[in-house]
Amino acid sequence: MLFRSGEVADPAECKRIADLGIDFLAAGIGNIHGKYPENWAGLNFEVLGKINEATGDMPLVLHGGSGIPDEMIKEAISLGVAKINVNTECQLVFAEATRKYIEEGKDQQGKGYDPRKLLAPGFEAIKTCVKEKMELFGSINQA
């Protein structure tokens, strides 16, 4: 597989896949899904550059973008990454905001147990997270 946890793809294999006529390519460059361990080695920019060169500047996808340091994200974008998935980060901020709402007892006040109220802080936290990521990724006001 091309994007298993921490694996690094072969640029020649990426070229063969790109030559099939796909629109985007998600290739492993040391990225993983979920939370990154403290001893994570980071993204392999040398391989990313070779993949970008081999695939003719095809838009690349970075799975497991949550938790990758901003500078690494910027470097990946400069080397052809056009789409970055950050689902884990959104899930974590949603859970944290919802947990805070409940721990503060707001679900016990009035109709605070209404799912629309109970889940609203999590929804707002996701919106804030996505806006921050859009700014980091340079995708604000882009189609």
Where are these regions (language model features)?
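Alpha-helix-loop-beta-strand connector modules within alpha/beta enzyme cores
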Residues: 8, 19-20, 40-62
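Short, small-residue-biased leader/transition segments that mark boundaries at the very start
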Residues: 1-2
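Extended, intrinsically disordered, low-complexity segments
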Residues: 102-143
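Catalytic cores of alpha/beta
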Residues: 60, 65-81
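Structural preference for beta-strand elements that scaffold enzyme active sites
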Residues: 23-26, 59-61, 83
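Glycine-rich phosphate-binding active-site loops on the catalytic face of alpha/beta enzymes
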Residues: 29-36, 79-97
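Active-site glycine-rich loop that binds ribose-phosphate moieties when present
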Residues: 5-17
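Active-site-adjacent beta->alpha loops and helix N-cap segments on the catalytic face
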Residues: 34-52, 69-73, 92-101
